[in-house]
């Protein structure tokens, strides 16, 4: 027997999706494989998803896999690589508490006296629709069905039918939906799930309906006892597949409570299963109120992926009497507004306008090329493993793919992918990219990424073993097939080739020879292909660092694989808990190595990127910019934040930071240096076109202040528009800011404003400012930083003096557009 010991790396514990993936990995072997959770002293058949879930395994639990059988050595090698490298990817990223914390109710809403019910935010957003109550199904009628001689046959038929339905949905879905449906399919195909139902029928003589329900109750009770919220919330998945089985078995008894949404609807239910959610017309699903759903349920994951706002914590009996009435579900402030009046509806129309502006601006920002504050260009690219990930990466602002892990095509299968399959996969991502560069890393297999059909013998130290470019000569046919596929696809886009695990010049010379042979073959075969291709290497073996100058004669670029390079440089296994604290790329030795690579490559006109985890770490971005890297490639969700941060950094200041870091004596000194590093704040003018509006159709004072504060949030002048608005209202309550002549000047000095601003809205028609000075049709809002030297009283006074001048006022009211107002104010005012 062989054993793999590890700490559970899953933040949410061993729930349905990772259990399904682990079961799939284990099921391909003849050996018996037992999963053990040592904290719980729980054992499970690793080829059963349900048994794995039942171990109650949480993050960082001490676990092991015991493997015993004829193929135990090969199984251990492959499963160890899976546990160490890919197991964590089967978990899902959950929203932070900050993302699920409701904003305090803004004054611009509370002053309108809305009829509100308060709940808890589960998925952020705002939805407007009709409240519709969905009653829960009762299972009592199924439990009462007597046992029948046909029950066993019925069970097998229902399981097969449900599996067929799920497989059909899998063919039609992608993303989170596909992942969750796969987990459900795994559960119904699980021997333990169906076996328990059969035992209840044979040993306890229960009818099929009662056996399905009793099995559901037993499994749910075990999950409900878990210490993990995430595992407790898998109860919904067990209930979902069990109820589907019941409805398939007796469709005539009672149709499932499916709802047809014919107009925008806010759905109110005790709970909603994933399959019920997927059956809804999402175009008309404005939001959901779910009484008992937790923040990590699969239904919530689907809702967030579909941008459906969700609240909980509202008792159904408190909402039932409002069924059929219009409402606004505000999952930003955590409220449900019942029967909103015109003023409340107007508030949410303004909120939607701001949300649309924000979404448009984010899309524009993502599409912009990445520059530092002083216009130093740096490419921001994505790391992906399949062509399906490419559109999402580009939507996040990826300017290309810095690492396409082609080995994913070779893994988890019985035979190698042929040339046509590879060509189609590579062509798909190139077509999605347009003219964006795609760097294909040739197959990094062998060693820690064992491929059974290659029959590479087991190694004592696979991370330092027979892998990547080292295996290519033995498997030259396999490598040539990949080269042919990439060269064919390269004729459809900007393809580049990167070779992993290179340690010497002879390897790259051999590869270049193979590329030329592949080109000759493709010409001979009359297949469309690229005549040349940009070639680079992964810099992950320390020996390469000392001969970068020689490699510059043979390749076009370098990409530093910081994960493996860190391990090899320090001789540290990052998966070994006894030495993993030593795994830290931010040390003087590592930074000096990066500096040497970049300097040598740049001297010879070659570019250098980084494609390990380090590339997406925002804390270390100033160092990477300062070291002169030309490209950062990272997980695509990190791209928007990295681009935004980069725009705030001055490359010269970062270069000095990197120089100082390389002179430090320890990692602790570098961390202290980073903590003390404060990027110079970009300076924005007090007056700017982005904050000036004409002919705004506001119906009240509240909408004007709401819009102007919210717009400052959209434009990045504040990260806290709700808090800034509160400061404006507090000043407004001391004395109204109407100054006469149809003008109001709301103002505040606030800690929540990042860039002091003057915002202007000239209204389409006057509004009541609740002031003795009469109605207002021009709003000039001053928001100055609390710690800035600018005196808001002086600014206010200068504006007031100008407004006394009739000609100045008339010019403001007569201005044709926002630019005319800006030009007038810049001419007349001095701050």
From Swiss-Prot:
Pfam families: PEP-utilisers_N, PEP-utilizers, PEP-utilizers_C, PTS-HPr, PTS_EIIA_2. Mg(2+) binds at residues 540, 564. It is found in: Cytoplasm. The keyword Protein transport does not apply. The modification Phosphohistidine is found at residues 15, 298, 747. GO terms for biological process: phosphoenolpyruvate-dependent sugar phosphotransferase system. Phosphoenolpyruvate binds at residues 405, 441, 563-564, 574. Its cofactor is Mg(2+). Its main location: cytoplasm. One of its GO terms (cellular component) is cytoplasm. Residues 119-650 are annotated as: PTS EI. Its EC number is 2.7.3.9, 2.7.1.202. This is Multiphosphoryl transfer protein. It comes from Escherichia coli O157:H7. The gene is fryA.
């Amino acid at each position: 027997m062989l054993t793999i010991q590890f700490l559970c790396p899953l933040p949410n514990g061993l729930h349905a999706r990772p259990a399904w993936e682990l079961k799939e990995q284990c099921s391909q072997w003849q050996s018996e494989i037992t999963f053990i959770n040592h904290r719980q002293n729980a054992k499970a058949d690793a080829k059963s998803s349900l048994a794995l879930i039942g171990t109650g395994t949480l993050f960082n639990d001490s676990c092991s896999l015991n493997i015993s059988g004829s193929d135990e050595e090969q199984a251990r090698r492959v499963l160890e690589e899976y546990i160490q490298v890919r197991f964590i990817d089967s978990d899902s990223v959950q929203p932070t508490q900050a993302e699920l914390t409701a904003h305090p109710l803004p004054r611009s809403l509370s002053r309108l006296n809305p009829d509100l019910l308060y709940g808890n935010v589960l998925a952020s957003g705002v939805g407007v629709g009709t409240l519709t109550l969905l009653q829960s199904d009762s299972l009592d009628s199924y439990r009462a069905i007597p046992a029948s001689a046909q029950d066993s046959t019925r069970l097998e038929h229902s399981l097969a039918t449900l599996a067929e339905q799920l497989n059909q949905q899998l063919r039609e879905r992608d993303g989170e939906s596909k992942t969750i449906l796969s987990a459900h399919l795994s559960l119904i195909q699980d021997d333990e799930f169906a076996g328990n139902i059969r035992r209840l029928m044979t040993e306890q003589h229960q009818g099929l309906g009662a056996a399905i329900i009793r099995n559901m109750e037993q499994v749910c009770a075990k999950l409900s006892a878990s210490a993990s919220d995430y595992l407790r919330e898998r109860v919904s998945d067990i209930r979902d597949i069990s109820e589907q089985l019941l409805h398939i078995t007796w469709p005539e008894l009672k149709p499932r409570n499916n709802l047809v949404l014919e107009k925008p609807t806010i759905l109110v239910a005790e709970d909603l299963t994933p399959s019920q959610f997927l059956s809804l017309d999402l175009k008309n699903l404005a939001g959901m109120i779910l009484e008992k759903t937790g923040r990590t349920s699969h239904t919530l994951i689907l809702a967030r992926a579909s941008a459906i706002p969700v609240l909980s914590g509202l008792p159904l009996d408190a909402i039932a009497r409002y069924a059929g009435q219009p409402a606004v579900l505000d999952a930003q402030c955590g409220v449900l507004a019942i029967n909103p009046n015109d003023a409340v509806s107007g508030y949410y129309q303004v909120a939607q306008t701001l949300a649309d502006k924000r979404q448009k601006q984010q899309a524009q920002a993502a599409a912009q090329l990445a520059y530092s504050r002083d216009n130093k260009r740096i490419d921001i690219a994505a790391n992906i493993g399949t062509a399906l990930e490419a559109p999402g990466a580009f939507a996040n602002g990826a300017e290309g793919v810095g690492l396409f892990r082609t080995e994913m095509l070779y893994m988890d299968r019985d035979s190698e992918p042929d040339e046509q399959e590879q060509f189609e996969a590579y062509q798909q991502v190139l077509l999605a990219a347009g003219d964006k560069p795609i760097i294909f890393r040739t197959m990094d297999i062998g060693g820690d990424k064992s491929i059974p059909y290659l029959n590479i013998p087991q190694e004592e130290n696979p991370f330092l073993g027979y892998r990547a470019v080292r295996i290519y000569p033995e498997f030259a046919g396999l490598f040539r097939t990949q080269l042919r596929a990439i060269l064919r696809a390269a004729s459809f886009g900007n393809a580049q080739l990167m070779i992993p695990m290179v340690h010497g010049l002879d390897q790259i010379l051999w590869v270049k020879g193979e590329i030329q042979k592949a080109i000759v073959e493709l010409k001979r075969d009359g297949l469309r292909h690229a005549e040349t291709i940009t070639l680079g290497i992964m810099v992950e073996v320390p020996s390469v660092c000392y001969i970068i100058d020689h490699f510059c004669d043979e390749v076009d670029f370098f990409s530093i694989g910081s994960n493996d390079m860190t391990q090899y440089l320090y001789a540290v296994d990052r998966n070994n808990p006894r030495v993993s604290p030593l795994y830290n790329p931010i040390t003087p030795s590592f930074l000096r190595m990066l500096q040497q690579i970049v300097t040598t490559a740049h001297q010879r006109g070659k570019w250098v990127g980084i494609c390990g985890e380090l590339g997406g770490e925002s804390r270390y971005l100033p160092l990477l910019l300062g070291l002169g890297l030309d490209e950062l490639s990272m997980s695509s969700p990190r791209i928007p934040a990295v681009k935004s941060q980069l725009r705030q950094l001055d490359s010269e200041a970062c270069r000095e930071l990197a120089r100082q870091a390389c002179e430090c004596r320890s990692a602790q000194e570098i961390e202290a240096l980073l903590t003390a590093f404060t990027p110079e704040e970009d300076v924005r003018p007090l007056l700017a076109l982005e904050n000036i509006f004409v002919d705004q159709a506001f119906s009240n004072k509240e909408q004007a202040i709401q819009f102007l504060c919210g717009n400052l949030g959209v434009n990045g002048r504040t990260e806290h528009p709700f808090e800034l608005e509160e400061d404006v209202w507090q000043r407004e309550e001391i004395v109204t800011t109407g100054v006469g002549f149809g003008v109001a000047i709301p103002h505040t000095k606030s800690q929540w404003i990042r860039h002091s601003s003057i915002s202007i809205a000239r209204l389409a028609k006057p509004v009541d400012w609740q002031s003795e000075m009469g109605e207002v049709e021009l709003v000039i809002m001053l928001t100055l930083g609390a710690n800035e030297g600018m005196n808001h009283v002086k600014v206010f006074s200068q504006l007031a003096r100008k407004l006394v001048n009739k000609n100045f006022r008339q010019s403001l009211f007569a201005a044709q557009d926002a630019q005319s107002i800006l030009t007038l104010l810049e001419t007349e005012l001095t701050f």
